[in-house]
Amino acid sequence: LLSEKTVNGKEITPNLNKLVQKSLYFPNTFEQVNEGTSSDADLMVNTSMLPLRQGSTFFRYPNTNYNSLPNLLEGEGYATSAIHPDKGSFWNYKNGLLGIGFDKFTDYYSFNVDEQIGLGISDKRYFEQVVPMLKELKQPFYAETVTLTSHGPFDLPEKYRELGLDPELNESKLGGYFESLHYTDKQIGYFINQLDKEGLLKNSIIAIMGDHTGIHKYYDDSIGQLSHKEDWYLNTGNPTVPFIIYNPSTNEGKTFDKMYNGEIDVMPTLLYLLGVDKDKYENTTLGRNLLNTNKSFAVITNGTLKGGENLTDKEKDIYKKSLDLSDKMIRANYAHNSN
């Protein structure tokens, strides 16, 4: 997230910047995906488990049982739905997400893909069709949805480019990244406004998270080729993604800028906010509730521990081993075998 960053005096993500002021914001959320990339993010957010050490979890073990976010919320009376702009066969999303516990899976074939940008349907046309789908769900509901336009290769059509970048930057991958994020930010603003108009916003909590890093993960070399570079263009070596929790019923936000955390911490944090008894999940999640912890750390996929200054050496060793522990638990179908 290019929080509060500007080019030519224009904010890259003005809608998200406003949202952050009224949200719980975790700017040091570390990417923990492995070989399943985007699908690993779906896994972690919904199960608080780290992905397999080799291959895609959704392809290799789509039928593993989990004490998952959708399963737990179904127990609280929620309908659950996963909505994806990709085809269900991509990363084996359909089998993987239904296996995790979602009641319903909606994919590419349910959308009118009359405008495509990059990998698939434009975020504008996607959100225009997602809102009616959400309106049809029985309340209360938990819905997960994914956007595509801010994903590489960042080839946003000129007609949607609004930042007025200089020619060199505009033609570069970095410029395309800025413009793609600006476009997606605009569509997120539209989406939230539409939820409000349809009466869906006031009783909702909206969590926004990136699945993995963008420009530096795949196009880092292209930045070095620019004749002019701002310091903040450069790779810091910390692969972080945004994690924002917006509750429209509260006006005060809080930024946890000293907190280091990972994608596996999303599920226990959301369950805490939704009032689900911690006894139902705290012994089956590898992540932690970020609103009730003094531990600041994340284990990334190469085994590096980020943060953790207040951890003992024994704790650091245990957390580093969580990568292999999760791998064994998934392959052993831990939730099924514990019942």
List each model region and its residues.
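Solvent-exposed soluble domains appended to multi-pass membrane proteins
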Residues: 1-339
